[in-house]
């Protein structure tokens, strides 16, 4: 019975690629319809006015306008909205 483990079999060496999550457009920025505002896992940010949510919880603008962030409700939820600009 060997008392030393055979060399050359490391159990390390794996890592996952970064997912590039986070806020993509900040408050006050002008965005066009379809622009991605936030990439997230779950819903740290909720969809407000003129904002849609994709199946992976990505928030995107449904209208052209200015991005705004707000905290609303008893649960103090963070909402992302787009204030529509009339053109």
From Swiss-Prot:
One of its GO terms (biological process) is translation. Coiled coil: none annotated. GO terms for molecular function: structural constituent of ribosome. One of its GO terms (cellular component) is cytosolic large ribosomal subunit. The keyword rRNA processing does not apply. It comes from the Bacteria. Keywords: Ribonucleoprotein, Ribosomal protein. PANTHER family: LARGE RIBOSOMAL SUBUNIT PROTEIN BL27M, RIBOSOMAL PROTEIN L27. This is Large ribosomal subunit protein bL27. It comes from Dichelobacter nodosus (strain VCS1703A). The gene is rpmA.
């Amino acid at each position: 019975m060997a008392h030393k483990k055979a060399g050359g079999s490391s159990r390390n060496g794996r890592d996952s690629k970064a997912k590039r999550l986070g806020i993509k457009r900040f408050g006050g920025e002008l965005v066009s319809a379809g622009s991605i505002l936030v990439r997230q896992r779950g819903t740290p940010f909720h969809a407000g006015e003129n904002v849609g949510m994709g199946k992976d919880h990505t928030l995107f603008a449904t209208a052209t306008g200015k991005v705004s962030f707000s905290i609303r409700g008893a649960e103090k939820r963070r909402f992302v909205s787009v204030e529509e600009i009339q053109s």
